[in-house]
């Protein structure tokens, strides 16, 4: 028994020790001898585990393993991360019976999909007299404060959002580092751990019946999670940013999209909270100011800088728009989403899209890369999403969102749903504007002129010369035999006549727009510049 109680640090997102206000709150009484219990609970939903593929689950488990190793290293083995499987309130109740909990501290999960879980925890704490502490650190600003500052309603345009956060002020700097080396930690008895469903060590994906699929052999990049990896990648990313700033341009990943090189994105680490968004934001801004100052000393003026973290601000906007909208991930009941009459769900079309069997090499390569690695360049995300919806198959964005949430490492509920609504012209876009449709063939020729990407992820086409690799349907029967690629046998026929589909879809969008005498309240860009700057918000 511990007479003064113990403090729980409940990890959900925010899988890190740096910039962790919840950790600081849990350590406030350490000088009084109140020990710490760091926990993560597999409850079937937290950290996006309701529907999760192998790569996403492995990334999460990597992150938990890294946390456990850091805790043990900093405390010479006295501290560790307790990983449970079960219902959080039942676990907390049982812990309280054994060690009398004083506080439960957690990073605020602002999305409405976590409301039921967190409200149950609050009710339990009120019942048992436990203090429940939530701290904002997964976003730059508290979305609830943004809405309150905007008069109690979410800002319908990005410009309104910017105006609101300017009133609030710049985002807080990262919190000070927590000193855990001298903290006291609870050691749970083996019988109690077993009773509570506590793992002896961080489990593997197979424990949850999640297995690597048959696309794994295509993987070029093996993403690993964890704070240690995230901070190392941040240093590499800042070198890229410095080089770009010194050359006078910003957002280098957008200025020169390269679908073949190893990505330098931090988005997966931001999604799981292995890297603090505030640490990233201020690291980039401080770097730009230093580069700007050094240039000024040399008599060189570097202009701009307003957009260097623009993608992070869009991330904030999507979080804010979702916070009071439990139907944000669907059309029905979603007040900001236009109800577009998509075609009846066609499982054959959807499955061919999911598996990369559409007959369009760039689409197929991208969808297979997603399954193999859990990753896609932002340009490819836009392309496959447009192809599924208004730019091709005319299927609803909802199945696409579900697929991305399962397999994409950095997919979180708010940002991923917001991106799908934008790309499908359902929200955050000019009203039902289908004028900008990416042609996957033309894009492939521009981004992959030699066919390197296609040969890697669509090996059926590896023998094709570059003149045909993006349009294999142009091969004659003799050429198909020569290059050992029979269309319809080794590689599928095209799923649709794309040019006809695009024209039909544009007509449908135009007809729907004309039928709306009074357009519904619609999240939209404030001006053309926002449309120009928008890319799938992934490659932060």
From Swiss-Prot:
Residues the entry annotates as binding FAD: 237, 265, 267, 311, 378, 410-412, 416
Domain of life, per lineage: Eukaryota
Entry-linked InterPro entries: Crypto/Photolyase_FAD-like_sf (IPR036134), Crypto/Photolyase_N_sf (IPR036155), Cryptochr/Photolyase_FAD-bd (IPR005101), Cryptochrome/DNA_photolyase_1 (IPR002081), DNA_photolyase_N (IPR006050), Rossmann-like_a/b/a_fold (IPR014729)
Cellular component terms per the entry's GO annotation: cytoplasm; nucleus; perinuclear region of cytoplasm
Residue intervals of the Photolyase/cryptochrome alpha/beta domain: 5-140
Alphabetical keyword list: Biological rhythms, Chromophore, Cytoplasm, FAD, Flavoprotein, Nucleotide-binding, Nucleus, Photoreceptor protein, Receptor, Repressor, Sensory transduction, Transcription, Transcription regulation
Compartments where found: Cytoplasm; Cytoplasm, Perinuclear region; Nucleus
Purpose: Blue light-dependent regulator that is the input of the circadian feedback loop. Has no photolyase activity for cyclobutane pyrimidine dimers or 6-4 photoproducts. Regulation of expression by light suggests a role in photoreception for locomotor activity rhythms. Light induces the degradation of cry, likely due to conformational change in the photoreceptor leading to targeting to the proteasome. Under circadian regulation, expression is influenced by the clock pacemaker genes period, timeless, Clock and cycle. Binding to tim irreversibly commits tim to proteasomal degradation.
Protein name from the UniProt record: Cryptochrome-1
The species this protein was found in: Drosophila pseudoobscura pseudoobscura (Fruit fly)
Gene behind this protein: cry
């Amino acid at each position: 028994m511990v007479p003064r109680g113990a403090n729980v640090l409940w990890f959900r997102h925010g899988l890190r020790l740096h910039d962790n206000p919840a950790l600081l709150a849990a350590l406030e009484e350490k000088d009084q001898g109140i020990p710490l219990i760091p926990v993560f609970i597999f409850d079937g939903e937290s950290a996006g585990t309701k529907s999760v593929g192998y790569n996403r689950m492995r990334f999460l488990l990597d992150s938990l393993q890294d946390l456990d190793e850091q805790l043990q290293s900093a405390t010479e083995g006295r501290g560790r991360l307790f990983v449970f499987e079960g219902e959080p309130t039942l676990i907390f109740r049982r812990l309280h019976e054994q060690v009398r909990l004083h506080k439960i501290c957690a990073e605020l999960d602002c999305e409405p999909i976590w409301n039921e879980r967190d409200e149950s925890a609050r009710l339990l704490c009120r019942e048992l007299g436990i203090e429940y502490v939530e701290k904002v650190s997964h976003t730059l600003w508290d979305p609830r404060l943004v809405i309150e500052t905007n008069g109690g309603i979410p800002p319908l345009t990005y410009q309104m959002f910017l105006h609101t956060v300017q009133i609030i002020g710049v985002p807080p700097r990262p919190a000070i580092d927590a000193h855990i080396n001298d903290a006291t930690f609870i050691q749970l008895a083996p019988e109690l751990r077993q009773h509570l469903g506590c793992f002896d060590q961080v489990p593997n994906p197979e424990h949850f019946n999640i297995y690597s699929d048959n696309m794994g052999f295509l993987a070029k990049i093996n993403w690993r999670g964890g704070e240690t990896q995230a901070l190392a990648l941040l240093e590499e990313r800042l070198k890229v940013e410095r080089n770009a700033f010194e050359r006078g341009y910003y957002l280098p990943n957008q200025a020169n999209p390269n679908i073949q090189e190893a990505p330098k994105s931090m988005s997966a680490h931001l999604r799981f909270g292995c890297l603090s968004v505030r640490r990233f934001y201020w690291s980039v801004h401080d770097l730009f100011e230093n580069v700007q100052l050094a240039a000024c000393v040399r008599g060189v003026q570097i202009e701009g800088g307003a957009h260097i973290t623009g993608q992070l601000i869009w991330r904030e906007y999507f979080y804010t728009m979702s916070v009071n909208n439990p139907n944000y991930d669907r059309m029905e009941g979603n007040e900001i989403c236009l109800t577009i009459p998509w075609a009846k769900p066609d499982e054959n079309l959807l499955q061919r899209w999911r598996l990369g069997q559409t007959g369009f090499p760039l689409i197929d390569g991208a969808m297979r890369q997603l399954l193999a690695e859990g990753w896609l360049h932002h340009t490819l995300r836009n392309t496959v999403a447009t192809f599924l919806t208004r730019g091709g198959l005319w299927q609803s964005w909802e199945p696409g969102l579900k697929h991305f949430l399962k397999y994409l490492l950095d997919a979180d509920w708010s940002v991923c749903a917001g991106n799908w609504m934008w790309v499908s012209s359902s929200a955050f876009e000019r009203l039902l504007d289908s004028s900008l449709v990416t042609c996957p063939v033309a894009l492939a020729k521009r981004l992959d002129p030699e066919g390197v990407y296609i040969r890697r992820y669509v090996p059926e086409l590896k023998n094709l010369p570059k003149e045909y690799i993006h349009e294999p349907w142009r091969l004659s029967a003799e050429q198909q035999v020569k290059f050992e690629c029979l269309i319809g046998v080794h590689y599928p026929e095209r799923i649709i006549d794309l040019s006809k589909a695009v024209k039909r879809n544009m007509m449908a969008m135009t007809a729907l727009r004309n039928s709306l005498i009074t357009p519904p309240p619609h999240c939209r860009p404030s001006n053309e510049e926002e449309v120009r700057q928008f890319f799938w918000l992934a490659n932060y």
